[in-house]
């Protein structure tokens, strides 16, 4: 039984914590374990984003927001919380769920059963805010037994726009910095406010057992659930420095353990419902 199928998992955290790297590794590991995976790059400020981490190709897919009419049609959820619609329809998209077959190939990058979408990027000065991209991240729910990973912008602004309303799990990536723990605590509280306890922290860039213990204790004091740890990985660090795709790395084994633990936690939750 694939516990994570039909789940939407949002990944957030402090800037520089390694969100996109972790999302790319989670996506590849889920694919390896037989899942059909959708990756949503919802970070308008990261020019390379997930595409750079997953592909050696030069040209990224077209912005997904254009399929829905661009920012001329898609509104910011803070100003207009109503559901998104298709470009030639006024019917709320949550009433007629998206089928992948209706989206032209130019809007996606595919690798076997993994499909990546870039919602949109800020490319020019004064072109406007990225609020409409947040609505796409909130409402883009695909028909079928996919697991969807949503890589949002750094910080917590996405909570203000309500992106988390349509997700099943929130994962917050925490690196060894004080600010990262502050954000993790806020994320846990805001997720709880929305009525969900399915929020867990993944410790990243852990370079020693001593640091890992300090980080775990800090999570405990702040009442943030711990899911797993990823050690500092030179291969990931080098790929980030050179702007290249992440190849094989030691972190993959840790990622597999994190996915297994998440499956077990959600399976236990289902048994108690």
Where are the model-predicted features located?
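Residue-level preference for the first positions of well-ordered beta-strands
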Residues: 8-10, 36-38, 114-116, 147-149, ...
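P-loop NTP-binding site
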Residues: 12, 221, 225, 235, ...
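N-terminal phosphate/diphosphate-binding loop that engages ATP/GTP or pyrophosphate donors
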Residues: 31-111
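Active-site loop/turn elements of alpha/beta-hydrolase fold enzymes
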Residues: 42, 119, 232
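Conserved catalytic-core segment of NTP-binding enzymes
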Residues: 128-232, 237-238
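C-terminal boundary of histidine-terminating zinc-finger modules
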Residues: 242-252
């Amino acid at each position: 039984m694939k516990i994570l199928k039909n789940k939407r998992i949002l990944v957030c955290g402090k800037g520089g914590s390694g969100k996109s790297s972790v999302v790319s590794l989670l996506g590849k590991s889920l694919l390896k374990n037989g899942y059909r995976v959708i990756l949503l790059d919802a970070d308008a400020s990261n020019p390379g984003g997930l595409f750079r981490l997953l592909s050696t190709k030069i040209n990224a897919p077209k912005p997904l927001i254009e399929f829905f009419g661009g920012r001329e049609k898609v509104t910011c959820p803070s100003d207009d919380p109503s559901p998104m619609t298709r470009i030639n329809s006024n019917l709320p998209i949550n009433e007629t769920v998206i089928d992948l077959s209706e989206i032209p190939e130019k809007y996606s990058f595919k690798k076997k059963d993994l499909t990546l979408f870039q919602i949109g990027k800020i490319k020019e000065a004064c072109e406007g805010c990225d609020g409409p991209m947040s609505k796409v991240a909130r409402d883009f729910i695909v028909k079928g037994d996919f697991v969807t990973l949503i890589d949002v912008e750094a910080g917590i602004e996405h909570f203000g726009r309500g992106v988390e309303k349509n997700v099943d799990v929130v994962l917050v990536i925490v690196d060894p910095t004080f600010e990262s723990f502050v954000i993790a605590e806020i994320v846990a509280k805001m997720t709880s406010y929305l009525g969900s306890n399915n929020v867990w922290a993944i410790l990243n860039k852990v370079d020693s057992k001593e640091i890992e213990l300090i980080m775990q204790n800090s999570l405990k004091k702040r009442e943030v659930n711990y899911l797993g740890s990823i050690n500092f990985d030179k291969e990931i660090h080098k790929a980030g420095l050179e702007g290249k795709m992440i190849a094989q790395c030691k972190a993959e084994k840790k990622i597999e353990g994190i996915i297994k633990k998440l499956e077990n936690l959600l399976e236990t939750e289902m048994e108690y419902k």
